[in-house]
Amino acid sequence: SMENIRKTSEIYHKYGIPFFVDACRFAENAWFIKIRDPKYKDVSVRDIVREMFSHADGCTMSAKKDAIVNIGGFIAFRDPELKQRIAQNLIVHEGFLTYGGLSGRDLDALAVGLYDGVDESYLNYRESHTRYLGEVLRQVGLPVYMPTGGHAVYVDGGKALPHIPQSQFPAVALGNALYLAGGVRTTEIGSLMFEHADPITGKQLFAPLELLRFAIPRQVYTRSHLDYIGEAAEKCMREADKIRGLKVTWAPKVLRHFMAKLEPVE
């Protein structure tokens, strides 16, 4: 909410800490402020965005999200001195300030995407698609976290497959089953990503939730595509007791969820 943004900014500034925001979903968050906060129902998304960023000292932006491009991003600053310090690293590692390692085509697409991303008809379409998929998945028996968000539907893989313990990654197992059932690709946000050893006891600690994320590509799917995802999910749930857990056979020391290899538990 705008109130949370404002209060968080005040706390940071009270202690002399610059308040930077992760801006990758700025437009979708502005849309939710508009449709959920009565004070902003008659305020345009663009004006809501301006107010959101008025509380910040800067931002980081993965433009692959709400700028609707396939590559790129930026960092923005209010403090010109801080900008200069960061700019030196940019020149050394990425490219000059005017392009930052991106092609002209990608810069042009990013500029257009920032405008398109705050179009209210687009945001309404985007949010309604996500909401629709959430309802489709609920109807076939998947435990969906409600209300759904702007870019994805989250399913509780642990509840969907209660016979699979956390040590065998139930959300990954459900994601694999969906891919085999219908070519539906999802992402685990659970213990494959977050499991770690307690620094004091050495005990393995699992993630609080075993989530499976259904992130929806933008401006690509029709509702028939979402119905197809539901059909694949329904097939999985009919045979849920046959889905087996998984074990890691190889993993790098860091970021294992990107590169790990797993196989079914016998």
Where are these regions (language model features)?
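PLP-dependent enzyme catalytic core of the Aspartate aminotransferase-like
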Residues: 117, 181, 193-266
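Short, conserved charged micro-motifs
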Residues: 83-84, 162-170, 219-228
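Active-site loop ensemble at the mouth of alpha/beta enzyme cores that anchors a bound cofactor
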Residues: 158-185, 199-207
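Feature representing long, continuous alpha-helical segments
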Residues: 131, 135, 172, 176-180, ...
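Conserved glycine-rich beta-strand-loop-beta hairpin in the small C-terminal domain of fold type I
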Residues: 130-131, 145-157
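Short acidic (Asp/Glu) and glycine-rich catalytic loops that position anionic groups and cofactors
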Residues: 87-90, 107-116, 151-160, 207-213, ...
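Conserved PLP-enzyme active-site core in the AAT-like
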Residues: 1-144, 165-166
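Short, glycine-/Ser/Thr-/acidic-enriched flexible segments
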Residues: 65-67, 79-82, 115-117, 150-151, ...
